[in-house]
């Protein structure tokens, strides 16, 4: 859901403000004289040339649809008239107006949210104010969706047995710490607004760290197989915005909060920010804005979610991720965090690590590929891929094995020239990040092979050949 911003007054100061915000949200500019209108239009800015004190000009700019309005002319009487008309035509927008020296009561009696003195605040400060206003409006929208859903549920309830929990918070399939922590945070926000909720997931809770997180923090999750969608009036999807990652088919989605960029779902409320490293950072920002202090368990979960999704702040990390982590630092339980990060390693995982080391085949001196055979715990594969990456001279690893009727592949790299997400997507329809990715493919015709040694050779050769082909390494170059 994009915020529509209208800037009225495109003088030197208005121009500076627009330069700070024009690449982030749809912008409409209104002024009597705009010399470079054609250039602005090419940059995606909507330009309205006219007198903003006139209703027809404001309506032409669709002022009624504006989320944020900035009134930035330097003429006091003009600003007052514009503010009056904007308050009338766009009552729900967040309004920021320029203060004029010697006119301290210029906007008295008008519903102006913020008055800015440009002698004290620069264009960058105004841009920051716009960002704050956008967040405030987003949270108002989120609250509205939740409250309306609760009201619908209350109308439907007839007896105690028919009582509905208004909100279902759904993570992506096989949820990771970021998804789980973000769901916990949304549940906390909803409770603050008087809305009960359940958290549900599909697939498996993988990795020893994830299981330790759930057990140590006492996180209550429901499996989608054990819920009835008809029992909920609001559906929120967390840490994914693509249908492929949903654990259950949903007729409608009310809320989507995510940080991935492969969006194909829509909802009444959407906050999708690909530039942010973790969804937990977005939810932490919500808590900060609403002055909600997280419990020790919630803070620990959110901190670990940010940490794990950004690979300890080394992968696709934004300013917000650092700010969120810094805020959470004083609330976390360090001893529990340490136990989550360092769970006991099972015997099977140790055996897979050993097989990966023993079976590794090194290509071009720094790419290690290892087939580990048939395993029951797919989560051992990324651990093995990480483990091989620590070996001297190795910069990229691919570890693969058979889990049930599928071949699972996990990859890691320190080589900035490679994008593992793209490589595994092209090779096997998988995905992930530049430095870490995964894929799975049906075992297919290989299921008919009963001899384990023959199966090993077939799978190892087929997977290795496809990976090297996509990377661009020819057989004779190995």
Curated annotation (Swiss-Prot):
Residue ranges constituting the RCK N-terminal domain according to the UniProt record = 2-120
Q: Which GO terms describe its molecular function?
A: nucleic acid binding
What Pfam families does UniProt report for this protein, alphabetically?
Answer: DHH, DHHA1, TrkA_N
Example GO BP: potassium ion transport
TM segment ranges? none
Alphabetized PANTHER family for the sequence = BIFUNCTIONAL OLIGORIBONUCLEASE AND PAP PHOSPHATASE NRNA (PTHR47618:SF1)
The protein here is known as: Uncharacterized protein MJ1633
Q: Which organism is it from?
A: Methanocaldococcus jannaschii (strain ATCC 43067 / DSM 2661 / JAL-1 / JCM 10045 / NBRC 100440)
